[in-house]
Amino acid sequence: MAKDNFNSPDYYAIDKLFSEENILIRNITREWVKTNVSPIIENAVQNDEFPFDFVKGISDIGGFGPFLPEKYGGAEIDLMSYGLMMQELERGDSSLRVLSSIQSGLVMKLIYDYGSEQQKLNYLLPLSKVKW
């Protein structure tokens, strides 16, 4: 079981620039990674495995389309919060950040921007809740 060694000093007091929402979203994601990813990811990588429970976990913390309106399964978070969420997923494993950002940015965002209302209703909520 790998130890979570993340303990980075904030030399430039960057945390002071973040809103309470930014910090809350970062900390929720960080805790999920620390609890669910860090203990098993090294072994999974060494065995060429991807724990698919991670997909449900990312959905549970709102990691698919979090910047979209609630009507479509998002939480309407700002882009700073989204970036902090992606940073924390990346800290756990690059594949997690890729999974979330590709589904959110290249799939869901395009449906939201260019899809009909019916397409948005048909696809965005199921994609945010991994009910494909």
Regions found by a protein language model. Name each.
Residues 1-21:
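Intrinsic disorder at enzyme termini
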Residues 37-132:
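Glycine-rich flavin
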Residues 1, 29-30, 95-99:
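A short, ordered amphipathic alpha-helix with a cationic face
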Residues 19-34:
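Mature N-terminal segment immediately following signal peptide/propeptide cleavage
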Residues 14-15, 22, 47, 74:
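Short basic coil micro-motifs at the edges of alpha-helical modules that engage polyanionic partners
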